[in-house]
Amino acid sequence: MSSIASVFGREILDSRGNPTVEVEVTLESGLRARAAVPSGASTGSREALEMRDGDKARYCGKGVTKAVDHVNSEIADALLGMDSLRQVQIDNTLIDLDGTDNKSRLGANAMLGVSMACARVAASFLGLPLYKYLGGINAKVLPAPMMNIINGGAHAPNNLDIQEFMIMPVGAMTFRDSLRMGTEIFHMLQAILKKDGHVTSVGDEGGFAPNLKNHDEAFAYIIKAIEEAGYNPGTEVALAIDAASSEFYKDGKYVLAGEGKTFNSAELSEWMAEFTRKYPLISIEDGMAESDWDGWGMLTASLGDHVQLVGDDVFVTNPSILAEGIAEGVANSILIKLNQIGTVTETLDTIEMAKEAAYTTVISHRSGETEDSFIADLAVGVNSGQIKTGSLCRSERMSKYNQLLRIEEELGDDAEFFGPMLAEYYSLGTEE
């Protein structure tokens, strides 16, 4: 009764109005589940391939009918009759069927939609919440949220080079309280920006995108919003950034157009270090470009003992690339994005490898999202401790936060919120 009776893909729209893949899997028992695939704006060059049609006469070339056709033909034929409870076997079948290193024949978007939907319907068959199915009986840690409240870089049409400025309400004792704190700070920031004459429209991930003098002004606005919301920066609320440095890495130099500065790797590392000295900055994502492994080594040597250095573009949720990074001592954390690798099994393998190497993990959304809340369950399932799923508006972001509220409620007294543990471990990014 847990065997797969049908696999059906369809083209839907994501939060940016671009097509994406949704897959529905039905079991012989009649149970059915669906999953929708996200899409990124700033992407690593070694990510698994997201298949687009390229037909400029339809959705400006961004249609996904080819990927959907693969779901409804080759993939469906290969999976019919398979046991939905055999996730590893299902994902290995998808990988073998594709036959490429980067999932370019079938498309990672086609494969991931199927993989996620199979996991969800299997959980339903067993009568388990998805997080318990993915993680087992010890799945209980509610992640500290990284809330993106000011956008720059590829996510906003302004003069900020850093892509994301985030708050982390680590002083809360529950996820529910951390969400409330973040929301209050978000609305306070909106009021402050509006009072100062800045536009308060939001970017792809729900953060504000004001034109500011420099990055220090962005930090200053956030600190002011934290304080005026009634919280203490550095004890109750920490900061995090996603520099997305690959986006401004040109010919071996880091060209910060908004700042009017050009840095080499050592200078950029020092620029980042200065932020950690001035602000309660505990986490820096993609502080160096994906191809600048020497720069990553410098940054890790400089800050790695007291700041979380998250590798996104440099690792692209790929276990073989992560293994290289661990061997080279690059970064101390990895961002986990399901669609960078293309199957649930490979994602879980990468998370396990990171944990064995004492790298932290941050479960992440993409800038082009859907209402699917799979990553909320994944974060709790693997006890990641951190999640990055956007700002405090836009329903495709709220769907993840609201699912975490439900999970915390369901876990009751067993729930553990990771915020205070994170704050203690990183000492809020201060230097002795």
Curated annotation (Swiss-Prot):
Originating gene: eno
MF terms in GO: magnesium ion binding; phosphopyruvate hydratase activity
Pfam families membership: Enolase_C, Enolase_N
Cofactor note: Binds a second Mg(2+) ion via substrate during catalysis.
UniProt-recorded name of the protein: Enolase
Transcription regulation listed as a keyword: no
Gene Ontology biological-process annotations: glycolytic process
Disulfide bonds: none
EC number: 4.2.1.11
Cofactor(s) named in the record: Mg(2+)
Function, as annotated: Catalyzes the reversible conversion of 2-phosphoglycerate (2-PG) into phosphoenolpyruvate (PEP). It is essential for the degradation of carbohydrates via glycolysis.
Active site, UniProt feature: 205 (proton donor), 337 (proton acceptor)
